[in-house]
């Protein structure tokens, strides 16, 4: 039987857009916690609260974004609209020094754009393959790894521009990246003719007198304003609770929709994977908050007289993802038909194990800081690289399973639910964890002593927590191996 030897041409436009979206999103993210603490002079508690609220709501909106794509917009249009909104949000963020309202409004616009973009970019990629196409896993790993080109360059470029010019210029550069990606994507429109387009019948149908396109416009205006209020009043946790309840209700409905035992098993597998992904990302998302402030305060960042901007360290994680992801995609492709196929539970155990190893290295770094006043940069880079490598064994596996499910018309919503739990809930938990390192309640001397010990405790606890997750995953793997010893447990099954 002939096997396709190359990826669909359309994937390269999807990958290009993903690269620039990563550049835009992670360029801003690398600056945000530092902007809040160093420029706006927020205390650690306030900065962590706003940062985690933003990162949580970013992953709530994909549920609505997935629904709109499934029912009305189609994946391609949803992705383009989301990219446009994110570009606008980054531009508005540059004006946030003028008034706090601009800060909240800009974050709200980015949240809405991300909701339309993030879940549907994966679904758009899934449309390029048939369900059993052996190139699918390689395509998802390629998307995940190649997208990190943007997140490698972004912290370096945005961090440098911010350091040399201004915070506003750093955020503006992130916006330019998103606009560039959108233009490239539009140039490849002809390669997406076979994908799902806008549902014109649904768009022109009337609901409560008005056509649905009018309600869509109202939603695009009202949603950013509502989210702005949530940031301003610090009500985001309530929105998170409501979204979680709705998400679980939708998940229950999808389970009832399943018509075969195979579909129910596939859905059950996705639920378990999502749970472990949630724990993984609660640990990993320390990179943008507590780890970033730890580097800023306790790591010697000087090379040949030049002090490396803290934001640039965000590139280390992404570089590890890109480099190792290309190799992993090749290994999966080469082993697709044989006994060397990487098992799904083995991937998750390895990912969580690497996360534990990464935080173990950070614990050593923090102990050195406590002993000598600062830690070395190479040790920090090693820890971040190990944590970046770990990501390749989590999200690509889970996303590939979601897009393969045979229940019709639910991939967008399932992706949104996955983003809700592994993104929104995980980021909320990450904020709770990061807050344990806050030093705002102490004077300058006491804060330093308290903070370094707090970092040691938090990093050490995450090390052991991730190891406990590895043990649970290995137990599930062993159970599945014994139960289905005569059937392969390959990722594509």
Curated annotation (Swiss-Prot):
GO terms for cellular component: plasma membrane. It is found in: Cell inner membrane. The keyword Secreted does not apply. The chain crosses the membrane at residues 14-34, 49-69, 91-111, 138-158, 167-187, 212-232, 235-255, 267-287, 312-332, 344-364, 379-399, 413-433, 458-478. It is a multi-pass membrane protein. Signal peptide: none annotated. Keywords: Cell inner membrane, Cell membrane, Membrane, Peptide transport, Protein transport, Transmembrane, Transmembrane helix, Transport. One of its GO terms (molecular function) is peptide:proton symporter activity. Its main location: membrane. SUPFAM superfamilies: MFS general substrate transporter (SSF103473). GO terms for biological process: protein transport. Belongs to the major facilitator superfamily. Proton-dependent oligopeptide transporter (POT/PTR) (TC 2.A.17) family. DtpD subfamily. Probable proton-dependent permease that transports dipeptides. This is Dipeptide permease D. It comes from Citrobacter koseri (strain ATCC BAA-895 / CDC 4225-83 / SGSC4696).
